[in-house]
Amino acid sequence: MRYEQPPGPGIGSTPILSVEGLRKRYGEQTVVDGLSFSVRRGQCFGLLGPNGAGKTTTLRMLLGMTMPDAGTLQLCGETIPGHAHRARMRVGVVPQFDNLDPDFTVSENLQIFGRYFGLPAATIRKRMPGLLEFARLEQKADAPVRALSGGMRRRLTVARSLINDPDVLVMDEPTTGLDPQARHLIWERLRSLLASGKTILLTTHFMEEAERLCDELCVIDNGRKIAQGKPHELITHEIGCDVVEVYGDDLPALRTLLAPLAERVEASGETLFCYARDPQPLVATLRSQTETHAMPGLRYLHRPANLEDVFLRLTGREMRD
């Protein structure tokens, strides 16, 4: 049995999740500060932000696990936190950290989780083969969870979140700690869920993940929304030009040389980021410097702007703990 649903209707016009004026304080610290956004049915919506921006706290309030200090929340037609239990029956959750039971087998983890939703044993048994196939764990059904690789455990966690056939998936950094192959497999599975009509709300630190999966993004910092839009719109609006990354032994001299040829130059560590609408003069200058060995150790990379450029422009390049 495959985990299949009728083809999804695409992205709807009615929000399945709405957040308005959400606030949360811990003592003197405001963690979420007047946050508002909505997610439409069938959409993949991404929450982006540096560490401590308020992403996980926002998810906890959406699920009724943390009480907001102000604001309104609606999830699957239910008011949160008043009817959080009813809403959660229609939601699947993929937490940031693994919370599978290592003493049980793959199948037992699915069975036990299904009971939390009050599902009949027959319903759980009917859904399990499709979920195991979805996670590519058919051959591991009777294996203990502790024997699985990190990628297998993460796929099982995603499959487990589907046991109640949810309308919405809430995913907190779903591919953290995975190697590239495992990450791409998770992305493939998430795209199939979106195609079937599921709605996904995710947080992630992987900008490529957000750019590949998300229909819309909300960037938050210090608990506030600082930008929202489709990935390509954010790239065009916030960056709007090509990027040339420059590495060399003498960054001050390189900056002096290149600044007149770029709209903007930013330094981060041992790298200069040069933003240019017409990058050819800049690239030609770098090529000349490389060919004549005028600047030892000089290397450069010319590329289109991407979502990571947007993220760093909006939130800064300083390290966050």
UniProtKB/Swiss-Prot annotation:
It comes from Ralstonia nicotianae (strain ATCC BAA-1114 / GMI1000). It holds the Pfam family ABC_tran. This is Nod factor export ATP-binding protein I. It is a peripheral membrane protein. Part of the ABC transporter complex NodIJ involved in the export of the nodulation factors (Nod factors), the bacterial signal molecules that induce symbiosis and subsequent nodulation induction. Nod factors are LCO (lipo-chitin oligosaccharide), a modified beta-1,4-linked N-acetylglucosamine oligosaccharide. This subunit is responsible for energy coupling to the transport system. ATP binds at G49, P50, N51, G52, A53, G54, K55, T56. InterPro entries: AAA+_ATPase, ABC_transporter-like_ATP-bd, ABC_transporter-like_CS, ABC_transporter_ATP-binding, ABC_transptNodI, P-loop_NTPase. The lineage of its organism: Bacteria, Pseudomonadati, Pseudomonadota, Betaproteobacteria, Burkholderiales. Gene3D superfamilies: P-loop containing nucleotide triphosphate hydrolases. The complex is composed of two ATP-binding proteins (NodI) and two transmembrane proteins (NodJ). PROSITE patterns: ABC_TRANSPORTER_1, ABC_TRANSPORTER_2, NODI.
